[in-house]
A protein has these predicted regions:
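FIC/Doc superfamily catalytic core
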Residues: 1-270
């Protein structure tokens, strides 16, 4: 959350509401026109700049990290191909990811509770366990969607709807903020207004398939940042974003199976 503030304070404060002025067809690409972005933690960041960022993101340290990350992903992909029965890991690692990703949102269950519920050992799982199980269902709903259509805003809605067990709606009411819920101190207020948020989501989706010649892992990070900054839904944005990361890696053929346990690292390195 603080990263949103730190990366945005370089622009000057401006209270004019942003509007998408037009879509321009340039070389068969949709280009969204936005005014100069400005930021204040006290007002909705309706002027959130679309991707790509103006700053250079593929720095030497980033590129070195990408080489290492891709080597590890290739090893994981090969290991999955060599396992005679991949279901051994596809039935366990996504559940561990579901538990850890839910824990990031303070939805806490144990591996034992989760596996017992997944295998129908317990008649009535706890509410937290049910939520973690829905994360697993949302991941598989996203995979199913990916087999029918490319990654998109629609994918995000399918994933979030499965997570919440109710249709996910783009926020139309004000009041969402990132910060301290007790003191009400705000670090970041995401864009507000359904049309404004939908405009940001449309630009986010366009960037997925734009040719900006950035590495697929860098693109994943940028897309994740932008999705969380848009914060399009009333609930489930963080978990939805983490599932979209895995789906992006599969779409880019850096993974074959959803067996990347990223949330466990996040929980262990807060």
């Amino acid at each position: 959350n603080q990263a949103y503030a730190d990366m945005s304070m370089q622009s000057t404060r401006h209270r004019d509401m942003f509007k998408i002025s037009e879509k321009i067809d340039m070389s068969e690409k949709l280009v969204y026109s936005f005014p100069m972005a400005t930021y204040s933690p006290d007002i909705p960041y309706n002027e959130l700049p679309p991707l790509p960022p103006a700053e250079v993101v593929e720095t030497v340290p980033v590129l070195k990290a990408i080489i290492d990350a891709k080597e590890k992903l290739a090893e994981l992909r090969t290991a999955c191909q060599l396992i005679p029965n991949p279901e051994i890991i596809t039935s366990t690692i996504p559940l561990r990811e579901a538990r850890a990703s839910s824990e990031i949102e303070n939805i806490v269950t144990t591996n034992d509770e989760l596996f017992r519920a997944a295998w129908h050992v317990d008649a009535e799982p706890s509410p937290a366990t049910k939520e973690a199980l829905r994360y697993n269902s949302a991941l598989h709903a996203g995979l199913s969607s990916l087999s029918q259509r490319p990654l998109s805003e629609k994918t995000a809605k399918i994933v979030c709807s499965t997570l919440l067990d109710t249709p996910a709606e783009v926020r139309s009411l004000p009041g969402t903020f990132i910060g301290n819920p007790v003191t009400q101190q705000r670090l970041y207020i995401p864009p507000e207004g359904k049309e404004i948020i939908e405009g940001h989501l449309a630009a986010w989706e366009d960037y997925i398939y734009s040719n900006h010649d950035v590495d697929s892992l860098v693109k994943m990070a940028l897309l994740h940042y932008q999705f969380e900054a848009i914060h399009p839904f009333y609930d489930g944005n963080g978990r939805t974003g983490r599932i979209l990361n895995v789906l992006h890696l599969i779409q880019e053929e850096l993974l074959e199976l959803p067996v990347l346990y990223l949330s466990g690292y996040i929980v262990g390195n807060k």
